[in-house]
Amino acid sequence: MDNSKLTPGEHVASLRRLWKECFYDTDEFIDMYFTRVYSPQVDYSIERGGRVVSALQCLPYNMLCGGNAVLAGYLSGVCTDASYRRQGLAGSLVAQSVADMHRRGCTFAFLIPSGSEVLPFYRQYGFYIAIRRSAMPIRHSGNVTGGTCTVTPATAYSDVLYRLFARRQRERRGYALLHSREQFKTVVDDWIKGGNLILTARLGKKTVSYLFVRPDNEKKVLYVYDAPAGRDAAFASMVGQAQGMYPGYDMRAYITGHRAHNTFACARITDTSKALAAYAAMHPEADMQISVSGDKLIESNNGFYTVSHGQCTRSSAHAGSFTAMTLAQLTRMIFSGDKMSFNFLLE
């Protein structure tokens, strides 16, 4: 959304300056983001006085809901020049991106808030806490069964690594955001350049698993991202290798779901019918009649819905006993209890 006369090159240069002022990222990261993530198609921005003063990027993703694929969006880089804040600029961009996602057929939108202080701002536009995350201790006994694995650090992206990653995401129960080959390659490159580890485990000549590890040298903790659900020989071998490389460090794996308690990400339902259809397919035992109200941005989301036998139907008239739900209550219901694979790739 372009409201000024900057050339495309001037626009991107101004947007990069605004990004650096707001987020303090390194030049290397900014170069990577604007070369491999940013495009004019995902850009929402406002120009004033010959420069970009407010912006966000709405990145498209595919998402699995219990094995069924839907479209989703992720809001990245929401920022406003300090001189133009409290004028509703960022809010107008968020509202426009939400409306556009609905028109494109997206079921959900996501974002990672910079802190608890911005949650009230995003609630105005229908974003509510949906995903909590915690770092849980990993206990490594040193006993490995099921075969001997050779563990080596990956030094660059490989198609083998991507295939393992894609398979792990598709095997997860609950909700999972999927990442394209190019998105994953971007993350791998940035992860390695940032001094982090990607360990791979090989049984014989076959690479069977991987582990993303971020060392925190101040806390002396190794954080594991996107850990496999099972704790097999490959996992134990990689944990042992990581601890051998960083003796004396604790090791923790990030988890989401009912055991997690730290606010991590917010979700916005952009299509109630599709969201409830996905929920119904994942919960065939659910039998309920819901009246959804209060969505001022997407009024078509408001209405009467019946969830039964793994399906969702919509009624144009009030018939029967419906449970009234706000968008916030519906978001909590859909994401409560189910694990959401929403990992480091978006941080």
Regions found by a protein language model. Name each.
Residues 97-101, 106-112, 117-121, 125-129, ...:
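A generic, well-ordered mixed alpha/beta core segment in the N-terminal half of proteins
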Residues 94, 101-114, 244-257:
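Conserved GNAT acetyl-CoA-binding A-motif
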Residues 1-60, 67-74, 140-181, 217-220:
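Short amphipathic alpha-helix that is part of the acyltransferase structural core
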Residues 61, 78, 114-117, 216:
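An acidic- and aromatic-residue-enriched active-site/binding cleft used to recognize and process polar
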Residues 77-80, 86-99, 124, 230-244:
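Conserved acetyl-CoA-binding loop-helix of GNAT-fold acetyltransferases
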Residues 129-232, 236, 241, 257, ...:
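Amide-forming acyltransferase catalytic core, primarily the GNAT-like/NAT-type
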Residues 125-144, 225-233, 237-346:
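Active-site/acyl-donor-binding loops of N-acyltransferases
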